């Protein structure tokens, strides 16, 4: 049984509420990363999936942040507000209906529209100056302004000053780079600290906020492995910025605020139409999945073993270090010992004097990779779209050129037209990964732009 995806009554708008039954850290004790294995019970939902699908998870906003927003604004939280899902108390709207972890441009622009868009300015002018002697009280300086631009001797004209909040707002509206930097690194607690002086009604507070969106995570299990469950491999986003500790909205929700077998979490299936195993189980597959990109390949390997497929399985995996970030080490070792994994190449970027990435190992194995592809193998990539997937893509083209006897142009056409579009043997599950405002704290998951 290969598992299947089917239409379900459960969706992003109507998720199935279930519980997490297992939630543990996969990293070694020395790791600075926090990658968790999370298992959801599907109960009597009727939800079905196949290896390669994704699970949608509906997060809830942190209650402490909700309460801080209410405190700053002076609201009780019981005020009734209008939302796209109907009327509800403001506290409920901030918890379950809006994204409060990152400020939206629309919200900032709404402030500008309400305030008229211009930074109010004030002018301070010295109109007189008197100075008396500390000895006998006699008047030493007696100066009065004679008109605009007149300043006493020894003074420098400073120009105009304005309300700090209004000046900041004017800068954000007029400078797109400043706007991007501001919204990337701040949530609504930060923003209200800057703009609370503008004043809000409960309804105005919500105007321009983004609606709360589910996050998609590549499923890390075959439906036939532990029936009635679905597994995820999730990198927890944690960082400090503007003197506050923060987490990704959904990853922090699952890691910190979901009590095992107790907290209800909304989920639904997001089927893939292309990132699937070959129908012919005798076909070889090559899988490239560093970091949490390993998730769908754990599902693939489980499914191939359960099906008894005879095709060979070649897995490229990588991360920072073997000791800290070798995810599912025991499972991978067991599969390798039993021949389920035919070849297993590991790349560690922070172990030793040289940074080694998966594309470097592909280059070293270029001739064999070409032989597999030339023999009908499928090639899969999962993970970071911006860097890793691009490097793997260009490396694959180089391999096909060098060992397939093609010009660089012909190799590019072979990969991008032949393998990807015509034969559909080159399949990718890639996305822009979330990074915290500090580039040193990069964490990964399959999710839209924010965690």
Task: Put a short name on every predicted segment.
Residues 1-436:
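FNR-like FAD-binding dehydrogenase module
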Residues 434-451:
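Single conserved hydrophobic/aromatic residue that forms the stacking wall/gate
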């Amino acid at each position: 049984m290969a598992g299947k995806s089917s239409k379900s009554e459960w969706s992003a708008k109507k998720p199935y509420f279930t519980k997490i039954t297992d939630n543990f850290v996969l990293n070694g004790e020395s790791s600075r990363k926090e990658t968790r294995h999370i298992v959801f019970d599907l109960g009597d939902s009727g939800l079905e999936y196949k290896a390669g699908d994704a699970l949608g998870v509906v997060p809830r906003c942190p209650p402490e942040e909700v309460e801080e927003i209410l405190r700053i604004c002076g609201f009780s939280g019981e005020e009734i507000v209008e939302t796209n899902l109907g009327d509800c108390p403001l506290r409920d709207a901030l918890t379950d209906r809006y994204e409060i972890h990152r400020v939206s441009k629309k919200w900032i622009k709404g402030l500008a529209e309400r305030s008229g868009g211009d930074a109010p300015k004030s002018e301070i002018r010295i109109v007189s100056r008197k100075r008396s002697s500390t000895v006998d009280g006699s008047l030493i300086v007696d100066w009065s302004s004679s008109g605009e631009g007149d300043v006493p001797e020894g003074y420098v004209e400073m120009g105009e000053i304005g309300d700090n909040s209004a000046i900041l707002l004017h800068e954000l509206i007029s400078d797109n780079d400043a706007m991007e930097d501001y919204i990337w690194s701040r949530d609504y607690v930060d923003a209200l600290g800057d703009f609370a002086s503008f004043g809000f009604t409960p309804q105005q507070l919500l105007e321009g906020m983004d609606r709360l969106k589910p996050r998609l995570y590549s499923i890390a299990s075959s439906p036939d492995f532990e029936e009635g469950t679905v597994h995820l491999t999730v990198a927890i986003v944690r960082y400090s910025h503007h003197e506050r500790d923060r987490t990704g909205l959904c990853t922090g929700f699952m890691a910190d605020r979901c009590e095992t077998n107790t907290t209800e979490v909304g989920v639904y299936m997001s089927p893939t139409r292309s990132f699937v195993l070959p129908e012919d189980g005798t076909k070889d597959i090559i899988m490239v999945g560093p970091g949490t990109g390993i998730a769908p390949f754990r599902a693939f390997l489980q499914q191939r073993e359960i099906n008894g497929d005879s095709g060979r399985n070649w897995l490229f995996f990588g991360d920072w270090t073997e000791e800290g970030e070798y995810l599912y080490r025991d499972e991978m070792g067991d599969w390798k010992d039993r021949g389920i994994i035919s070849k297993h190449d590991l790349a560690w970027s922070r172990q030793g004097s040289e940074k080694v990435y998966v594309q470097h190992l592909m280059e070293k194995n270029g001739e064999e990779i070409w032989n597999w592809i030339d023999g009908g193998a499928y090639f899969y990539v999962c993970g970071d779209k911006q860097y890793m997937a691009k490097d793997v893509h260009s490396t694959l083209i180089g391999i096909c050129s060098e060992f397939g006897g093609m010009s660089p142009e012909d190799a590019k056409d072979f990969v991008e037209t032949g393998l990807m579009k015509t034969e559909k043997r080159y399949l990718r599950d890639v996305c822009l990964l979330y990074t915290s405002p500090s580039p040193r704290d990069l964490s990964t998951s399959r999710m839209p732009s924010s965690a």
